[in-house]
Amino acid sequence: TYNVRNGVFSNAQTGNVVLMSQHLMEGNWMRALHYLFPVLAFAFGVLVAERIGHTYKNARKIHWRQIVVLIEILILLAVGFMPQKFNMAATMLVSFACAMQVQTFRKVNGYGYASTMCIGNLRSGTESLSVYIRERQKGALRKALHYYGIILIFAVGAGAGGICSMQIGVHAIWISCVLLLAGCLLMIKEER
């Protein structure tokens, strides 16, 4: 959304809070709202994902995480059809979907992580590296490399997504739909 939807982040709410605060301090109230609404949409996405997890925790036919991924796919698919005159609504919807992703997928291989941002992963990886340097614990090194691997994959995806968004425009978000669908299908296969 930053590249094709008026320079507003959907996954990095810290950036939106910084930019919103700057505009508030400058007295530019309308521009500040431009950054506030995606933050609120993100918060609402966390609430909805948490509610889905609680409500469908014991569902037998489909795992609650698959429900969240299917909702994300539908949201992102719709956003790809939205013209740029609806950038604020599109950014809010993507923020909502990103929040659902972050709330739903909080661990990988037993380690807590953030799927749509890097700061927590960088902190955890570097903390583990420090433990390895200090105590020579091989498990700490594995953990550090795990987090740095997540950051590398994130960076490759972000870079590819940025290039695609510059080349394809708002429709580049549909690539995310394909990747999410593949992930959902892998989750179904894993359950069987």
Residue positions per predicted region:
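Helix-to-loop junctions at the C-terminal end of transmembrane segments
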Residues: 46-61, 165
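Cytoplasmic-side transmembrane-helix entry/capping segments in multi-pass membrane proteins
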Residues: 61-70, 90-93, 114-118
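A membrane-interface helix-boundary motif in multi-pass transporters
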Residues: 60-66, 159-178
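Hydrophobic/small/kink-forming positions within alpha-helical transmembrane segments
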Residues: 39, 43-47, 151-159
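Small-residue-rich hydrophobic segments that form or flank transmembrane alpha-helices
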Residues: 1-32, 101-145
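Symmetry-related core transmembrane helices of the 12-TM Major Facilitator Superfamily/SLC fold
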Residues: 67-74, 171-187
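C-terminal ends and interior cores of transmembrane alpha-helices
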Residues: 72-87, 188-191
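Short hydrophobic/aromatic, small-residue-rich stretches within specific transmembrane helices
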Residues: 31, 35-39, 43, 147
